[in-house]
């Protein structure tokens, strides 16, 4: 529905901002019910190297309160386009790179850094122009990341307990305890 339309809309804008274009498609899927309890809130699965399977971005719907509708656009930009799917697909499709660099070794800090940048790119290229609630979700996610920095300092310097850290995150971000 809306997330697929969102993905199509931002994909159409990508040539205006990037020379390299991902050829692999991405599908948005629900995390299978039988693994929901232990699965992350959202995650990405690479497209098959031979092109036989598109990339997939999975959303965990075990508790829809963890992912209110207004937060899904930013999660989608993070996981799909211009996020993980875009970055990983371009690497996989690159000519002349050894397989170990293009598809085998992933660097989490680089990939997550790119995905956070992708959220910002989406905002900068106007992805939220007609979606004020979606932009609110983007800003809430930025606040969440800033709050994690405070929590890190609280735990390591101020000797906060785990409970104090969670209480802070809930009070500042408005997220549910179960999502932290």
Regions found by a protein language model. Give the residues of each.
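Long, His/Glu/Asp-enriched segments that create or flank divalent metal/ion-associated functional microenvironments
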Residues: 1-180
């Amino acid at each position: 529905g809306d997330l697929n339309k969102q993905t199509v809309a931002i994909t159409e804008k990508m040539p205006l901002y990037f020379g390299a274009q991902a050829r692999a498609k991405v599908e948005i899927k629900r995390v299978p019910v039988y693994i929901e309890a232990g699965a992350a809130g959202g995650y990405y699965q690479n497209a098959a190297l031979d092109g036989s399977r598109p990339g997939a971005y999975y959303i965990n719907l075990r508790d829809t309160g963890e992912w209110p509708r207004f937060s899904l656009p930013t999660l989608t930009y993070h996981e799909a386009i211009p996020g993980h799917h875009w970055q990983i697909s371009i690497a996989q499709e690159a000519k002349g790179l050894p397989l170990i660099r293009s598809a085998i070794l992933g660097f989490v800090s680089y990939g997550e850094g790119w995905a956070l940048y992708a959220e910002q790119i989406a905002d900068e290229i106007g992805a939220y122009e007609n979606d004020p609630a979606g932009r609110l979700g983007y800003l809430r996610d930025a606040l969440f990341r800033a709050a994690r920095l405070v929590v890190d300092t609280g735990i390591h310097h101020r000797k906060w307990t785990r409970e104090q850290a969670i209480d802070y995150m809930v009070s500042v971000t408005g997220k549910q305890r179960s999502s932290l």
